[in-house]
Amino acid sequence: MRTTSLLLLLGSLMAVPATQAADASDWLNRLAEADRQNSFQGTFVYERNGSFSTHEIWHRVESDGAVRERLLQLDGARQEVVRVDGRTQCISGGLADQLADAQLWPVRKFDPSQLASWYDLRLVGESRVAGRPAVVLAVTPRDQHRYGFELHLDRDTGLPLKSLLLNEKGQLLERFQFTQLNTGAAPAEDQLQAGAECQVVGPAKADGEKTVAWRSEWLPPGFTLTRSFMRRSPVTPDPVACLTYGDGLARFSVFIEPLHGAMVGDARSQLGPTVVVSKRLQTDDGGQMVTVVGEVPLGTAERVALSIRPEAAAQK
């Protein structure tokens, strides 16, 4: 990912009077509903860690409110995903390894009402992306535990034409940007049909009835548990405990897997905005590996990983 100063990004934009600052919340509300109100097709580029890829998307809102969507990577190995109402129907290529909670195009599911406590929201200017007029919003974190965004929203539909994810220094971590967007006609049926290599995805292998007996003793302010479940490990017969957390915009997941005495070391890595931190937790049954994966700063992920405890121990 190329480094870009947030000040330079914002300084090149037209200033908006302070009296319009309250409109930022209105635009975020439009963004939150845009993909359920607009059919479209287009091409966008994705940049992370200096690597670029180009994707085509077909997105159709049906008369009953259901949303059908197909994404196809246009360069490199063929990669495709088809979804209905956010549920993956089929997938192919390397996307199969990126499926869990992956953000495959520039719309993030969030609750606008939660954001004002943890982010400063401002209209900072106007721009033009993919030949379409846009308004520019700065979403700046109030602490060091989350990243900031610069959002260029289509004036006509509220759809995100460009999204920049920025660290605390204003450096670019991730970019989505449409190069072409057509909202004038809904995609045809054949454009939503999967290719022959797209593999049907079965029901998730999770046991939602089992209680997850783990919790975090520390969370970044504003982050709450959004889901907890047990799933089967892809490499062992052991169940893996899964906890997901979010603040209304940012999110991360915690996975706890038995080690049975295996000697596995701690690890940490970052690719663009995504961090992976693994910490060994000593327990009487041979240890557990705690792994935090998400789009939060590395130090935050490490602190969460170190705070994971068995439920009974955490309540003492």
Curated annotation (Swiss-Prot):
Signal peptide from the UniProt entry: 1-21
Entry GO terms, CC: outer membrane-bounded periplasmic space
Residue spans crossing the bilayer: none
Keyword Signal in record: yes
Gene name, Swiss-Prot/TrEMBL: mucB
Family assignment from sequence similarity: Belongs to the RseB family.
GO function terms (MF aspect): antisigma factor binding
Stored Pfam families: MucB_RseB, MucB_RseB_C
Matches recorded under InterPro entries: MucB/RseB_C, MucB/RseB_C_sf, MucB/RseB_N, MucB_RseB
Cell compartment(s), UniProt: Periplasm
Protein's job: Negative regulator of the sigma factor AlgU. Plays a role in the differentiation of P.aeruginosa into the alginate-producing form. Inactivation of mucB causes conversion to mucoidy.
A single BP term in Gene Ontology: alginic acid biosynthetic process
Protein name: Sigma factor AlgU regulatory protein MucB
Source organism phylogeny: Bacteria, Pseudomonadati, Pseudomonadota, Gammaproteobacteria, Pseudomonadales
Key words, A-Z: Alginate biosynthesis, Periplasm, Signal
Organism of origin: Pseudomonas aeruginosa (strain ATCC 15692 / DSM 22644 / CIP 104116 / JCM 14847 / LMG 12228 / 1C / PRS 101 / PAO1)
